[in-house]
Amino acid sequence: MLTFVGLGLYDLGDISVKGLEYVRNADTVFLEAYTSRLMGTDTAAMEAFFEKDIRVLGREDVEQTPREILECAAAGRVAFLTGGDPMVSTTHADLRMRAAAAGIETSIIHASSISSAVSGLSGLQNYRFGRSCSVPFPAKGWFPTAPIETIAANLALNLHTLVFLDIQNDRYMRVPEAIAVLEEMAEKRGIEPPALYVGIARAGSERPVVAAGAGANLKEMDFGPPLHILAVPADLHPMEREYLETFAGL
């Protein structure tokens, strides 16, 4: 049995009662630690809380060589822990399909997701979001412009864009850096950069930071520790504008 258990957004208080009960009764517990992180806790605290040893997995362990996960799931109850909600990532959908192909029963225990949290914190209506994108750390000889192209395509349809920010080991992209990268992409592609951004830090914590404004303003702002995420709004509905003025300093 392979059960995907969402941990929520920030700390151990975010897991559901159902998820907690399953993890504590699992035979094996894996933690996928590359698509997201819970910045309000760590692996040692999780092991103490769940009263279980936890095997931390990297991208290759899940996407390229998931044999150990599947073998454990064929023999007993496996809890596969993920930040946010498990099936927001296509990586996890692929693993579930591999398990099904091997005749292994699967299930999902849902949790809060950054996708819904952004709408709640920003007031941007969830049905007005188009395709999301991710901003990677630039590397020597590699500077993709797909993110700004996605944003431009959404804006042309009057749709908001959810922009995920890169995570690499202990390196986390911040909102000001992401805006600077997007502006460089826009210049490279000859695209007008977005006029308005909404930056969010530490969603799910007791004191998340939410700020809306022009890129020049948000690049000068200290959003504090990670994780950060960005939204690029299209034309604002009056209620969206009022919400951002009230809660995000627009």
Swiss-Prot record:
Residues that coordinate or bind S-adenosyl-L-methionine: L9, D85, V88, S113, I114, L165, A203, H228
GO biological process, one term: methylation
Alphabetical list of CDD domains matching this protein: DHP5_DphB
Biological or metabolic pathway of the protein: Protein modification; peptidyl-diphthamide biosynthesis
Gene Ontology molecular function terms on file: diphthine synthase activity
Record Pfam families: TP_methylase (PF00590)
Enzyme Commission number(s): 2.1.1.98
SUPFAM superfamilies: Tetrapyrrole methylase (SSF53790)
Keywords, comma-separated and alphabetical: Methyltransferase, S-adenosyl-L-methionine, Transferase
Assembly behavior: Homodimer.
Functional note: S-adenosyl-L-methionine-dependent methyltransferase that catalyzes the trimethylation of the amino group of the modified target histidine residue in translation elongation factor 2 (EF-2), to form an intermediate called diphthine. The three successive methylation reactions represent the second step of diphthamide biosynthesis.
NCBIfam families associated with the record: dph5
Full protein name: Diphthine synthase
Organism, as annotated: Methanoculleus marisnigri (strain ATCC 35101 / DSM 1498 / JR1)
Name of the gene encoding the protein in the UniProt record: dphB
